[in-house]
Amino acid sequence: MKEILLEYGEAEKIKVVPLWSASDDFKPICKEQNPFVKEHHLENKFVVMYSGNIGYTHSVECLIEVAKNMQTDNDVKFLMIGEGKKKTDLVAQAEELNLRNITFLPLQDFNVLPYSLASADLGIITLDENVSRVSVPSKTFNLMAVGVPLLAISNNDTEMFRLISKYQNGRCISKSNVDDIVAYIRELKSDKMLKQKYCNNSLLASKD
């Protein structure tokens, strides 16, 4: 973001505040010891999670198409957690398509959040292109703190792309490239070494 602001102002007037995460509350939790996993029957599932605002500034619609294209991947489960203006339409689309591989849950209490985020095998972050050039969703840092690989649904000219490129803890894919998103999920599910690398790098990034 500083680089962008330098186009419009003087360096000595710009103060960078370091990235944050509630690291004391958010830590990796193995699935066998995670009550959220047990409560929602996520054992033996590869969990693709979006958790947060399901509103106008978050490009989550493509996840319905991704879930549709992965209906035969019986070990993949999509979780969409949160509330927002788009949620009703997304639930209706999923029901119309009879998608059994996607579950919508309400916003979780803060004391549940460390467990819900840690249940993910892949964390989705996304922002509308109008704001993503200079912003990163705050959930990004909590996902990294629990050691989750990331999928940023965004273009390359974004803070999310720069963050993932720096720490090598996931991929950044445009919302229009549904096939690429599907391929990435399948690759991460099957390649244990790649997944572990991204997990480790997310943890390292959260402590940087």
Annotate each language-model stretch with its function.
Residues 58, 109-118, 123-144, 149-162:
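Nucleotide-sugar-dependent
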